Amino acid sequence: MKIANFEVGNGKPFFLMSGPCVIESEQMAMDTAGYLAEVTKDLGINFVYKSSFDKANRSSINSFRGLGVDKGLEILAKVKKTYNVPVVTDVHEDTPFAEVAEVVDVLQTPAFLCRQTNFILEVCKQGKPVNIKKGQFLAPWDMQHVVTKAKSTGNEQIMVCERGVSFGYNNLVSDMRSLEIMKATGCPVVFDATHSVQLPGGQGSSSGGQREFVPVLSKAAMAVGIDGLFMETHPNPDEAKSDGLNSFPMYKIKEFLSLLKELDHLVKSQPKTEL
């Protein structure tokens, strides 16, 4: 499949989805998109800018959710035009899907909603590439049912994304077998390195996170031969309005992406060991 002007999957080099969890302001969106676009261009990594206009699943009613669909889409359109990069954003059950699909290049469905059949069908009917996040409660092989629903719309541009599985209360673990298992869906496989280190509800009224484990999980996922890496970034994670504790510090990303590119090339240049 293709996102904008580049191929995804089938042994192609990994692509990056990255940006702040939520659009905090137009200036911040432009600054982060510009920096990430420059870094990925220098490294030769295909890049999709990610940020959300609405975080509908925040832990607390008092948490910052975003700037709303109208302002959010206006900013994403400006990012896309200014830096010539594709953009991805989350959609929810009450999102005006067609309006969003006119602006973004990829629609992303939240993990919590992966079993909502009507929601998945309506999103996929927009005809855009869709990144479907696997629920924290779902076995990797059960994503085949989700993919079958999605493709029943005639949309073949479907990706599946691992973002950790619930491990008791307020904790997630990443089962790297999941990445290999989900390849059986025939869809490109994406690893969400930052939400995988989230501690859901771990701060009482908000989620905690262990960003120090983002590098090790990202490298482990590269060893599996993933097609895409999802990694939320922020100029100052400790001041982020959403998911700061599991966000990657943006100004440290270039050196790390360079390492991941080397790992990706090494893994995909080797024959697969069959047992």
Curated annotation (Swiss-Prot):
Gene3D superfamilies: Aldolase class I (3.20.20.70). Pathway: Carbohydrate biosynthesis; 3-deoxy-D-manno-octulosonate biosynthesis; 3-deoxy-D-manno-octulosonate from D-ribulose 5-phosphate: step 2/3; Bacterial outer membrane biogenesis; lipopolysaccharide biosynthesis. SUPFAM superfamilies: Aldolase. GO terms for biological process: keto-3-deoxy-D-manno-octulosonic acid biosynthetic process. GO terms for cellular component: cytoplasm. Pfam families: DAHP_synth_1 (PF00793). The keyword Transferase applies. It comes from the Bacteria. Coiled coil: none annotated. InterPro entries: Aldolase_TIM (IPR013785), DAHP1/KDSA (IPR006218), KDO8P_synthase (IPR006269). It catalyses: D-arabinose 5-phosphate + phosphoenolpyruvate + H2O = 3-deoxy-alpha-D-manno-2-octulosonate-8-phosphate + phosphate. Its EC number is 2.5.1.55. It is found in: Cytoplasm. Its main location: cytoplasm. This is 2-dehydro-3-deoxyphosphooctonate aldolase. It comes from Francisella tularensis subsp. mediasiatica (strain FSC147). The lineage of its organism: Bacteria, Pseudomonadati, Pseudomonadota, Gammaproteobacteria, Thiotrichales. The gene is kdsA.
